[in-house]
Amino acid sequence: MLTHAVVQKNVYVALNENEKCLGFIYYMTNGVFGSYPYLHIVAVKEEYRNYGIGRQLMKYFEDNASNSSSTKYFLTVDDFNPRAKKLYENLGYQCVGELPDFYKEGINCYLMMKRRG
């Protein structure tokens, strides 16, 4: 999955001044209904959390994943990750659906959306 994403240039890596990976995102420009940007993964190494790196990665996603006709952004977040859900809400994303047992039995996933502009 990530190899394909790298070839498609849909992976963005946050590096420090020593070229050390701090985190990354993987997204699809037409991932939802073949029309809307979808964020597959945003990950920040634990020791680099709370420094704004996640916010910077999200900004990159929103600035680069959409085309001029895209009006919405989408992502999913698992119920066991309330910190990420809170970050997305603070960035303007709203929960538009719940997907029970989506990735794994007993784990709910929230579909979140943000309107552009």
Model segments located where?
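Conserved short alpha-helix immediately C-terminal to the canonical SAM/SAH-binding motif I
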Residues: L57, N81-A84
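Acetyl-CoA-dependent GNAT
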Residues: M1-E47, R55-Y60, N64, R115-R116
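Short hydrophobic clusters on alpha-helical segments that form packing/core surfaces
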Residues: F61-A65, Y73, A84
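Conserved G/P- and acidic residue-centered "switch" motifs that form tight phosphate/ATP-binding loops
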Residues: G52
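C-terminal "cap" of GNAT-fold acetyltransferases
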Residues: T71-F74, D78-P82, N90-L91, G97-G117
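Short loop/turn motifs at secondary-structure junctions
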Residues: Y38, S69-T71
